[in-house]
Amino acid sequence: MKAAVYRSYGPPEVLKIEDVEKASLKDTDEDRVLIKVRSSSVNPFDYYHRMGFLPVRISNGFITPKQQIMGIDVAGTIEAVSKNVTKFKVGDRVFGSCLGSHAEYVRARQSAIAVIPNNITFNEAAVVPCVALSAVQAIKDVAQVKKGQKVLIIGGSGGIGHFAVQIAKYYGAEVTAVCSTSNLGWVKDIGADHVIDYIKQDFTKNGKKYDVILDASAARTFFSCKRSLTENGFYMTENPTKPGFQLFQVLLGSLTRDKKMKGVGLTKTGGENL
């Protein structure tokens, strides 16, 4: 099969389209499915892995990447199932998150995928998993947003951000989204109670306080947002592995036991949340 492969870390030039051994189910697989990939997407996750930033190298190899096929989001049809798979059958249209999805075939756990709704195309489904699951984990699992809380989402028109706006609104929060001028209207249409044009206004200087600040674009530091938090509020960044101050501030928060600071990444690829 053909796949997008990187055998060393670096710029886009390290990516090559190569013929590699076709992915297949193993005799030891119990809960895996084989997916014929119809569509995939590109996320910051892929960029950080290809470039080989330090947090990535800790898990994926310091010199040479262990996982050499790119991709995490997938949409396609099930080609085969292992013995204990009960939720899916051959031919099902599915989407989800699994490593190595920039290829013609990929193995995935049944717990990491879901059936694509009939009114959704493969291309539309492929852009959902990573960003939507990250937003769910931030708003539902980490922040545990409740009705009446004030939530600020930086990057409210981005991939993670626009899902976070809708999810926070679903849980009854009063949602403020920060985005650019051209996106103010549609971000309000999808559920934001208030919108702030970051080009014209700095939310840290308007005197308002929020129970939760989610930086979905890693555009601001915790330290710059701290004065905009309520006494028991906290800040989350969706890109804790971003080079520079973001990783430093998350580590500092852990070392100082500062409960106001949390780094959130895609840690669970649960299909039930899709």
PLM region spans:
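Glycine-rich phosphate-binding loop and adjacent beta-alpha segment
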Residues: A219-L274
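Mid-domain Rossmann-like dinucleotide-binding core that forms the NAD(H)/NADP(H) cofactor-binding site
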Residues: A125-D197
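N-terminal Rossmann-like NAD(P) cofactor-binding module of classical short-chain dehydrogenase/reductase
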Residues: F95, I196, I213-L214
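Glycine-rich beta-strand-centered segment in the early N-terminal region that forms part
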Residues: A23-S41, L54-G100
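NAD(P)H dinucleotide-binding glycine-rich loop of Rossmann-like/cofactor-binding domains
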Residues: Y48, I63-D73, A80, R93-G155
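A short acidic, Gly/Pro-enriched loop at the edge of an enzyme's catalytic core
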Residues: T204-V212
